[in-house]
Amino acid sequence: MELEFQQLDLRYERLRARQPARERRLLASLADAGQQMPIVVVIGPSAYVVVDGHKRVRCLRQLHRDTVAAVRWEMSEADALIFRQLLHTEATASALEQGWLLRALHEDHGLALDALARRFDRSVSWVSRRVSLVRKRPVPRLGWRFAE
């Protein structure tokens, strides 16, 4: 499906760190070859909630595109976030990014720490440590950047 940018809810963009070098490479690829992979969305109360593809959305906006190709997953936001994390296996996700996601699932979606541990095949202690790591740190509004 093709969606216009104003139809998108980017609330989870802040859970991922920005990596300017990777973003520049993606921008060049999108300018050269167009969008090759759709973003992933779920239906929210008033918009399509972007679960995966925030970097593609930012780059397509910079290229002044009007729409973005998207695929809709038929599941809850929480299930979609967990599935995306497991699908990508997130070898590159930092402990802070993992903590922000787990905190959002725990606080915003009401999932218990033991339920999160089972879903991610981790110990309750691991989940608790990740959540504690970010509990006193506010989630950045626009994402944070890794140094290059």
Where would I find each of the regions flagged by the language model?
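Short, charged/polar connector segments at secondary-structure boundaries
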Residues: 1-73
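Amphipathic, charge-rich alpha-helical segments that serve as recognition/docking helices
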Residues: 15-17, 58-136, 144-145
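Short, proline-centered helix/strand-breaking motifs
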Residues: 36-41, 128, 135-139, 148
